[in-house]
Amino acid sequence: MRILLTNDDGVEAAGIEALVRVLSPRHTVVVAAPAFEQSGMSHAITVKRCIRLDRYRPLEENYGVTAYRIEGTPADCVKLYLEAISADIYPEYVISGINHGANLGTDVLYSGTANAAMEAYLHGITATAVSLDMKSEISYDTAATLLEENLTSLFYEEGKVNFYNVNFPRQFCEGGPQFVFTQLGRRDYINAFQKMEDEDGRECYFLGGEILDEGNSEATDIVAAERGYISVTPLQTDLTDYIYLEKLLR
């Protein structure tokens, strides 16, 4: 299968290298990933300046893949590759990740990882965003292997375009790794901004905070991850509130 890999942690990240290591022996792999970390970039794209890129030799020399290091956002990387670099030989499948840290619930709206996958989906290509809990006991290689083993049975369906958000937990539940289909939960934060001063004495704020997960049902990705399951959430790009729209049109 022709697979495009991207992420928001940057082309040098361990998570994307694990995917290359596991996938390249059996698939035709191309990497198009940011030159630098781009966490929290959501679906931002670069305008009013050139996007520079070069080849990333370490991945090419170690694994025999084609790899691009792109000075842009995660969405830039996918958009640029598909529209300008690919020579109309599109990948059959796009994987964004493996992200260092979970992308659960409403955090997907801010996630560069998830939105890079969404960019592929907008181009009519099945895409999966993959994340691993920051404190996970599970290795990137294990996550990549489980993904590859379930590629055609769980994620890729010929003739149909799907968009999934996948999260690996801190540790697997009793009985070993299990994939479960979920819906997005709601993730909030306590004291999200920390007030500070910069080197010039000016007031500034650092985004952080403690996670606050309340009121999420058993059907959500957040609860599934807490219980040690690998959550698989199908996503879409249509944000229309059809129930309310129907009322407005009456």
Predicted regions located by residue number:
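A cross-family phosphate/adenosyl-ligand binding-site feature
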Residues: 2-3, 14, 19-84, 88
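Short, glycine-rich nucleotide/cofactor-binding loops
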Residues: 5-12, 107-108
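Short beta-strand segments
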Residues: 6, 32-34, 71, 96-99, ...
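Conserved acidic residues
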Residues: 92-93
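Hydrophobic/aromatic ligand-binding patch that stacks against planar heteroaromatic rings
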Residues: 116-120
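Glycine-rich phosphate/pyrophosphate-binding loops
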Residues: 121-143
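Electrostatically charged, flexible surface regions
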Residues: 142-250
